[in-house]
């Protein structure tokens, strides 16, 4: 599933920091250019290892897209929305943080929606390795949600700040895609604190739960 989210005002050269499990193919789809142009601009060849954190030259980029991989998997019955409780971050930094906390597979969420810090776009959706490998989450033990819920986190501390408009727009798009593909009813799209048995304020007191309800209910 792909959706254009912004035009760059004509072909321009930008830099993209490689996230966990990213591929040249996916990066090329993000910016609407060919894989070959990325290989050439960065002196890479197909099959060369991609180092997480390396900044790639993206030549002649014209737009930025959401690119969401979908997999046939009947285990996904819920979507649980979180905040990272950090003002800054991206998939790479939170992946490392979760490894340090003992999460053997790193980043505990399946998707991360960036807030424009740490080299990522405001509202950019990053797919975590857990999603690519279709692994259980490590985002909500309560009610056994790690085994049945897709974990979506927005970068930010929403006990202190509000999500950005771009983050909420991207969340709406992602929820629509996931709900449609996995036939998840609106009542099963919930904030972390709404999970039975969860003792947390996540996704924070300034997260617009009413808007989440409206978005899930409308399918937009």
Predicted regions and their residues:
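Short acidic, glycine/serine/threonine-rich helix-capping segments at coil-helix boundaries
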Residues: 15-22, 35-52
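Soluble non-cytosolic domains of exported or imported proteins
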Residues: 18-22, 29-32, 84-89, 161-169, ...
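Envelope-exposed proteins and targeting segments
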Residues: 14, 52-54, 77, 107, ...
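Short, conserved "active-site rim" segments that organize catalytic pockets and cofactor/ligand binding
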Residues: 67-133
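Short, charged beta-turn/beta-strand-edge "cap" motif at the junction between a beta-strand
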Residues: 61-65
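Basic/polar, cationic surfaces and motifs that engage anionic cell-wall
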Residues: 1, 67-77, 115-129, 141-150, ...
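Primarily a LysM-type cell-wall glycan-binding module
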Residues: 2-32
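Structured segments of extracytoplasmic/periplasmic soluble domains
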Residues: 30-34, 41-44, 59, 84-87, ...
């Amino acid at each position: 599933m792909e959706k254009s989210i912004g035009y760059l005002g004509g072909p321009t050269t930008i830099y993209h920091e490689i996230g966990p499990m990213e591929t040249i193919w996916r990066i090329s789809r993000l910016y609407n250019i060919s894989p070959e142009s990325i290989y050439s601009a960065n002196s890479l060849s197909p099959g060369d290892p991609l180092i997480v954190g390396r900044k790639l030259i993206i030549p002649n980029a014209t737009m930025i897209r959401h690119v969401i991989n979908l997999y046939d998997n009947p285990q996904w019955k819920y979507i649980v929305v979180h905040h990272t409780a950090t003002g800054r971050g991206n998939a790479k930094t939170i992946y490392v943080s979760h490894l340090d906390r003992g999460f053997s597979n790193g980043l505990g969420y399946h998707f991360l929606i960036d807030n424009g810090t740490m080299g990522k776009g405001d509202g950019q959706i990053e797919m975590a390795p857990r999603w690519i490998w279709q692994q259980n989450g490590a985002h909500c033990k309560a009610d056994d949600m790690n085994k049945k819920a897709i974990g979506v986190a927005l970068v930010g501390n929403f006990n202190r700040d509000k999500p950005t408009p771009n983050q909420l727009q991207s969340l709406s798009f992602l929820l629509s895609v996931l709900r449609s593909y996995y036939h998840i009813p609106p009542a099963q799209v919930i904030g972390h604190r709404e999970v039975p048995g969860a003792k947390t304020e996540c996704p924070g007191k300034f997260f617009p739960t009413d808007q989440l309800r409206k978005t899930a209910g409308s399918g937009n």
